[in-house]
Amino acid sequence: GVPCLCDSDGPRPRGNTLSGILWFYPSGCPSGWHNCKAHGPNIGWCCKK
């Protein structure tokens, strides 16, 4: 997946570690991950639990 910003990473993408990944739905996030931000019907922002 493509790196994305999780809520726990901080307010801005720049200067922060991007610990999330963009994941295509509707298959859901990988095991051990959860959708931390809604990003349309076909893409989820998945972050580690």
From Swiss-Prot:
Subcellular location: Secreted; Nematocyst
Marked site: Not important for channel affinity and toxin structure: 34, 39
Documented effect of changing residue 3 to S: Minor decrease in affinity for sodium channels (4.7-fold on neuronal and 2-fold on cardiac (Nav1.5) channels)
UniProt site (Not essential for sodium channel affinity): 14
Effect noted on mutating residue 45 to A: Minor decrease in affinity for both cardiac (Nav1.5) (7.7-fold) and neuronal (4-fold) channels (tested by ion flux studies)
Mutagenesis / variant outcome for changing residue 45 to F: Minor decrease in affinity for both cardiac (Nav1.5) (2-4-fold) (with decrease in K(on) and increase in K(off)) and neuronal (5-fold) channels (tested by ion flux studies)
Outcome of swapping residue 12 to S: Minor effect on toxicity. Decrease in affinity for both cardiac (Nav1.5) (5-fold) and neuronal (37-fold) channels. Loss of discrimination between cardiac and neuronal channels
A Pfam family annotated for this UniProt entry: Toxin_4
Effect on the protein of changing residue 48 to Q: Minor effect on toxicity
Effect of residue 7 to A/N: Incorrect folding or very limited amount of mutant obtained
Site positions per UniProt: Has its side chain oriented away from the channel in the binary complex: 17
Site entry (Important for sodium channel affinity and for toxin structure), positions: 9
Site label Important for high affinity to sodium channel, positions: 18
Residues the record marks as site: Important for channel affinity: 33
Site description Important for most of the cardiac specificity, residues in chain: 49
Stated consequence of mutating residue 20 to A: Incorrect folding. Incorrect folding
Region (Well-structured region): 1-7, 18-49
Disulfide feature: 4-46, 6-36, 29-47
Residues annotated as site: Does not affect binding, but may affect the stabilization of the cardiac channel open conformation: 45
Family assignment from sequence similarity: Belongs to the sea anemone sodium channel inhibitory toxin family. Type I subfamily.
Summary of the function given for this chain in its UniProt record: Binds specifically to voltage-gated sodium channels (Nav) (site 3), thereby delaying their inactivation. This toxin has the highest affinity of all anemone toxins for the mammalian sodium channel, whereas its paralog Anthopleurin-A retains the greatest capacity to discriminate between cardiac (Nav1.5/SCN5A) and neuronal sodium channels. When tested electrophysiologically, this toxin exhibits a high affinity for multiple sodium channels with a 50-fold preference for rat cardiac (Nav1.5/SCN5A) over neuronal channels (0.1 nM versus 5 nM).
Name of the protein described by the UniProt record: Delta-actitoxin-Axm1b
